């Protein structure tokens, strides 16, 4: 993994674990957030979002779009 992918993965990790992401995205799913904290289901959703976003970014890097 080159430095570009590693940096983007770290930034995506910060975004997915941010309070804004939890409040606006994860909280839309039933039983994913309790008292503004992700439940186990919410943590799984964060992982799924991270994998999907990284896959998209990786594709864009491989196609020389990013």
UniProtKB/Swiss-Prot annotation:
Keyword Membrane applies: yes
For this record, the Gene Ontology CC terms, alphabetical, are: host cell membrane; membrane
* Keywords associated with the record: Host membrane, Membrane, Signal, Transmembrane, Transmembrane helix
| Ranges facing Extracellular side | 21-40
Q: Where are the transmembrane segments?
A: 41-61
Presence of the UniProt keyword Zinc in the record: no
Which N-terminal residues, if any, form the signal peptide? 1-20
Its localization reads: Host membrane
Describe its membrane topology.
Single-pass type I membrane protein
Positions in the Cytoplasmic compartment: 62-66
Locate the coiled-coil region(s) and give their ranges. none
Q: Which family does it belong to?
A: Belongs to the asfivirus B66L family.
What protein name applies here?
Transmembrane protein B66L
Species this protein is from: African swine fever virus (strain Badajoz 1971 Vero-adapted)
């Amino acid at each position: 993994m080159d430095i570009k992918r590693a940096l983007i993965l770290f930034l995506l990790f910060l975004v997915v674990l941010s309070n804004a992401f939890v409040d606006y995205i994860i909280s839309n799913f039933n039983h994913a957030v309790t008292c503004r904290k992700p439940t186990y289901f919410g943590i799984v959703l964060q992982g799924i979002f991270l994998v999907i976003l990284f896959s998209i970014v990786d594709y864009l890097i491989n196609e020389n779009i990013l």
